[in-house]
Amino acid sequence: MSTIDVGLQVTESDLFKATGDFLSVLFPDAEITQTQQNQTSMPKGGFISMTPLFLTDLSTSAVNYEHDGISDYGRAELRRVDEWQCQLDFYGDQAQNNATIFSRIARSEFACTWFMENANVLVPLYSGPPRQTSMINGEKQWESRWTLEFHANPLIVVSVPQQFMT
């Protein structure tokens, strides 16, 4: 059985990079991390962690065909509206303030413009409300943590070979 050349234009790594870059612009002093990484310890001080929650399809796929008019094969690009949810955990002395700032900015024209100009792989929709989710660390000390969910439309395109009649 032969393999099929399937392409994916926006990956999970792209979504994390875009979200992390945006967080770095808003909070330059905070370290930005991705959770679910093996053999990594929690950073010291204030930081923000990102955890993927859902990638939900909200529509059926729309198909765009690309063909050069000469060869027998081209590409079919499959696009649909998806919603990506990413949990953001804000830690440290400024956790509540930073979570509040992000929750307001996520639904703003500023956020939409920033992503379009700097990381055009997702469109921010909104943020859920920040909530306190304090935790006890490895030293049995309370850590300030505020959590929210960031909702966005990723601009994912899957492409597959398409035969054409020439």
Please annotate each region the language model reported.
Residues 49-51, 89, 125, 151:
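Residues in well-ordered beta-strands of folded domains
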Residues 71-77, 137:
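Short beta-strand/turn micro-motifs at beta-sheet edges
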Residues 1-72:
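Small/polar-rich, solvent-exposed N-terminal microdomains that initiate assembly or binding
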Residues 78-93, 102, 143-154:
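Oligomerization/assembly interface segments of phage tail-like spikes and tubes
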